[in-house]
Regions:
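ABC ATPase NBD coupling module
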Residues: 77-94, 120, 126, 242-247, ...
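Helix-to-loop junction immediately C-terminal to a conserved catalytic motif
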Residues: 56, 60, 331
Length: 546
């Protein structure tokens, strides 16, 4: 095959609503060659997902293609009737979506989900379909395909579910795969495995890949060409190695400067973790869950660490490593099976009733998804005020004044108090969640993947906010994350967990530069972004801040 598999020229897409016309994609051109990966990089609202929807013929009703061309080989896609587009989806264009849990039917086995791809395209040979399903599951690296084909999505890990979606996407050997944030919800080791799979499938079969991502490190590792979008317009395009090593657009330099790096640390004036008194002490923590007819499942097994007052301790590991269970035990939401948790001299494991309720004023949780943790029917101001009402603190006027103070403290306009969560951006919602957590003046924040769902620029802003709040308020953080580059920037000490056990703990500098455990080394090796070095990113950051 020669030429471009996908050729987009001068594409403009508008959204027409009651409020008027909004241009989501503005005069965008790009190409994807056979066996090549083109990465479409940008923040939320950059237009990258709208462009992907346009390629698939899945634009929402409010969207209008104002101008341009989308060609798949020699076929012009724009203007094709829906019936024709349906035959192309799956057969010539495959989709790997972001959320495997939301994309798979929970009441259908994974084998049936893959088989549906064949049936939709007219294949009725059940024996042949079953053989192909098992072949596909084996091809994407799923062990024991016959057993897995009979399982339901909830019985598979996130990485396995994403492999099932890839199997569906390649079932009919399409010319093009649109991979829309295919690994943003996955841990680094699973992410590497899934990206390796997409990469190898493309190279083996000559399939082109349009990789939609906000992760520059993923683009650096996997793409042949990069297109950087902002506000629907192309800021920069070219070979990935050139764009990321020598960016010409100011916006690209800003993205590179904001990307977390394993070799750089954000300087923070905080107490020395070695000499400051321990505020959090966890000793021999164990948490079991009973299982009918089987041995208990051990989620956390003999985890111990201390966190000095005013410092940040990170819990790092893959899904199922026990890091969230450990964090919830510190926050008082999980009672350990064995071991002790002490915070500011309080034995958390002995608390119940009123004592446990009062403990909520000492430790607060900040979750990964603020949209899920904030009541969508409750205005922002009311959400921040709610903990004060629950504890009977202050009158209405004093609470309103405190809400204004909290919004200002997290660098939000107090006028946002009258908005609903859905009316805010992801970064604004996370700031609201932090403001709500701080309204009771806690000593400790447990931050559970608090920045993992955010674009790189917004993520950098939230990390800077957390560093400032720690310095101003003397806060102690327990920072739960699967992103080691982020941990490198914010944490003083770290515990690496695997399958419930602590495999390594110590100062971040030592653990990351001279890891003692093979598990830690594997986590570090799986981090994307080795295609361009941190020195280049530093140079880009220097240029961006001049």
């Amino acid at each position: 095959m020669t030429g471009s598999m996908l050729d987009i020229r001068g594409l403009t897409v508008d959204y027409v609503t009651g409020r008027g016309r909004h241009t989501a994609v503005n005069d965008v051109s790009l190409a994807v060659g056979p066996g090549r990966v083109t990465a479409l990089v940008g923040e939320s609202g950059s237009g990258k997902s709208t462009l992907g929807q346009a390629v698939l013929g899945l634009l929402p009703n409010a969207a209008r293609v104002a101008s341009g061309s989308i060609r798949l080989g020699d076929l012009e896609l724009l203007g094709l009737p829906e019936r024709r587009l349906r035959t192309l989806r799956g057969a010539r264009i495959g989709l790997v979506p972001q959320d495997p849990t939301g994309s798979l039917n929970p009441v259908r086995t994974v084998g049936a989900s893959i088989a549906e791809t064949f049936r939709v395209h007219g294949d009725r040979d059940h024996a042949k379909i079953r053989r192909r399903v098992l072949e596909l599951l084996e091809r994407v690296g799923i062990d024991d395909p016959a057993t897995r084909a009979r399982q339901f999505p909830h019985e598979l890990s996130g990485g396995m579910k994403q492999r099932v979606l890839i199997a569906s996407a390649i079932a009919l050997e399409p010319d093009l795969i649109v991979a829309d944030e295919p690994t943003s919800a996955l841990d680094v080791t699973v992410q590497k495995t899934v990206l390796d799979l997409i990469d190898s499938l493309g190279r083996e079969s000559g399939t082109g890949v349009l990789l939609i991502t906000h992760d520059l490190a993923v683009a650096a590792d996997r793409a042949d060409e990069v297109v950087v979008l902002r506000g629907g317009a192309v800021q920069e395009t070219g070979r990935a190695s050139e764009v990321l090593a020598h960016p010409t657009a100011e916006y690209t330099r800003t993205l590179l400067a904001d990307a977390p790096s394993l070799s750089s640390v954000v300087e923070r004036r905080i107490p020395d973790a070695e000499t400051a008194r321990p505020l959090i002490e966890v000793q021999g923590l164990r948490r079991e869950y009973a299982r009918r007819g089987a041995e208990p499942f051990v989620a956390v097994d003999d985890v111990s660490f201390t966190v000095a007052a005013g410092t940040t301790h990170a819990l790092v590991g893959e899904s199922g490593s026990g890091k969230t269970t450990t964090g919830r035990a510190v926050a008082g939401f999980q009672r350990p099976t064995a071991g002790t948790v002490s915070v500011d001299g309080i034995d958390v494991t002995a608390l119940s009733g009123r004592g446990l309720r009062d403990y909520r004023r000492v430790v607060q949780l900040v979750y990964q998804n603020p949209l899920a943790s904030l009541d969508p029917r409750q205005r922002v101001g009311r959400a921040i005020e709610e903990p004060l009402r629950n504890f009977g603190l202050g009158g209405a006027a004093a609470r309103a004044e405190r809400v204004q103070h909290q919004l200002e403290q997290v660098a939000l306009d107090p006028a946002l108090a009258s908005r609903y969560p859905a009316e805010l951006s992801g970064g604004q919602r996370q700031r609201v969640a932090i403001a709500r957590a701080l309204v009771l003046d806690p000593r400790v924040l447990v931050l559970d993947e608090a920045v993992s769902a955010l674009d790189v620029t917004v993520q950098a802003q939230i990390l800077r906010l957390l560093a400032r709040l720690q310095e101003e308020l003397g806060l102690t953080y327990l920072f739960i994350s699967h992103d080691l580059a982020v941990v490198r920037q914010i944490a003083d000490t770290v515990s690496v967990l695997r399958r419930g056990r602590q495999v390594e703990t110590g100062p971040v500098e030592r653990v990351f530069s001279a890891p003692e455990s093979d598990d830690t080394r594997q986590l570090l090796a799986a981090i994307p972004g080795t295609a361009y070095n941190d020195e280049t990113a530093h140079e880009a950051g220097t240029e961006a801040t001049r």
